[in-house]
Amino acid sequence: DHRDLHSFPTRRSSDLPMQKNYVQEILSIIHSGLPKAELAEKLSDYHEKDLADALEALTPAERQSLYSILGVDTVAEIFAYLDDAEPYLKELPSHEAAKVISNMDSDDAVDALEDLDDTDKNEIVNKLDKDSVEDVKMLLSYDEDEIGSRMTTNYISIKNDMTIRQAMSELVKQAGENDNISTLYVVDENEHFYGAIDLKDLIIARAEESLESLIVRSYPYVTDREQVSDCIDRIVDYAERSLPVLNDAGKLVGIITSSDVVELVDDEMGDDYAKLGGLTGKIGRAHV
């Protein structure tokens, strides 16, 4: 829904309840002495951002114990919310750090690795699992001012010659490893970008319909070597949940998500400017 945000009723901030700070609750649970299984169950009720905020108040030994209780998948999600992952990664043996990084989305993994010096970074990268190392090395190859350095490889990709049933099957297959499923990106037999399909359109399509009839061929995109400063306005103006990123050959190499755009706006223009200009409001419409 791309109606202007001003058309929606709003509440004054004074009418809203204050956001609860869960960090103290989390710390109390961690220090409670509960059995590990019960501890893990209680902590699973909290958002990974709040768990990340609690790490700073723990000792290194407490953090190590917490990681073993939560498991590598949850720890990877927590690390994605750290402003500076360096001190926490350096507490881990390099093979353990590599397990955490391997379980992060590629863009979050690169953000965490870029906090490290080159020696520590390379040691971890060389121990990443084979599914992660290619994507991480690709993202690290871009200059920080290029769009490619900000994209993620976490997206759903399907072939343009599939049937509706095949596309649905492929969606289910890929969805377990990908969070960004609201838009499906379509490629041809040579992996060139072909168009995009809205998830809702695929779900309600009849099996006898052609996939081609659902594909938006003229879907907006950016290229991986574009400067962030040159295309940020264009990305914001489209107000999509994500946009495809293509290389010079026209192949799909990643996507830029709405959360990536918020970070771009903050980095390029500053948070205050973004709010004054209504840019974060435009981005927010992508979620409506």
Task: Give the location of each predicted region.
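Hydrophobic packing positions in regular secondary-structure scaffolds
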Residues: L16-L276
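Compositionally biased non-globular segments, especially hydrophobic aliphatic-rich helices
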Residues: R12-S13, Y185, I283
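Cytosolic juxtamembrane amphipathic/interface segments immediately preceding
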Residues: L279-R285
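Short, small-residue-biased leader/transition segments that mark boundaries at the very start
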Residues: D1-S13, H287
